[in-house]
Amino acid sequence: MDFPVFYNEAEEWKNALLLYDSALKQINTKLEILNNEFKLVHKYNPIEHITSRIKTPQSIARKLRLNNRELTIENIIKYVNDVAGVRIICSFTSDIYRIADLIAKQSDIKVLKVKDYIMCPKENGYSSYHMIVAIPVFLTDRTVETKVEIQIRTIAMDLWASLEHKIYYKFEGKAPEHIRKELKECSEIVAYLDQKMLSLNEEIKRYSNDSLQEYQAEIPDSNLSVVAEAIGTIIEEDEQTQKPEEAPVYNTEHAAKTGKKRMLFGLWA
């Protein structure tokens, strides 16, 4: 990374970058291990994907100026908490709190600050779970506690945040009132969607494999033909003797006359 705004502290900035980059690697490794263990033990991985980044010097300088701080490496380390950032995308809101709890329980991680924008969304509708943590980076001659910001959100939250950022960028951060209102309404839809998907997931988990099989066994054969008509295409039992281009289009009247069985979703109808 370049350092145009820190040219007088080039070496110090390189050293700081080493710390932040090392901290990100450690956090990413921990998350990968947790996700793999969760998948092995619970047959489910709560993390969809992870991204990480280090703030650009220009963005860091802008943040310091907004807080009336002098542009020095010392102030960056002391006052800019999100120089190194990790974003974790989960499937459900319950996964967010599960991951946050697992991170907090790591013996070498200190949780410095938490902001729950899911329980209390920002005024513009933004929702996410933020953690500022400190993780030790072991160098040859010392150990340095290095800060990392961790953002945890669902796929739906991430979609809204990404599109909201693009829209505001086009307006240079000054979107018209009706646009802001529409975005806020979209955030409410996203919150409803997350809650609905979470409820569905909890209901699905209540079904055991046995109950699912029992439910499937109760589906009348007549329903299969209805589904077949909706799908429109089917595979003949004797398709091995047909050329690919001769594969017939499903027709219930034809089926009744010929009496041939057809495969539908792995079932013979």
For every predicted segment, state its role.
Residues A23-L24, N28, E32-N68:
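Surface-exposed, low-hydrophobicity interaction/linker segments
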Residues N45, N81-V83:
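Short Gly/Ser/Thr- and Asp/Glu-enriched loop/turn motifs at secondary-structure junctions
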Residues M1-L24, N28-E37, E149-A269:
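An acidic, glycine-/histidine-flanked metal-binding catalytic module
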Residues E37-F38, R69, S107-L112:
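Short secondary-structure junctions
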Residues I47-I50, I76, I89:
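Glycine-rich, low-complexity intrinsically disordered segments
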Residues I77, C90-S199:
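Long beta-strand-rich cores associated with HINT superfamily self-processing modules
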Residues V83-C90:
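Terminal, regulation- and interaction-focused segments at domain boundaries
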Residues K39, T72-V80:
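Short, flexible, solvent-exposed loop/turn segments with mixed acidic/basic and small polar residues
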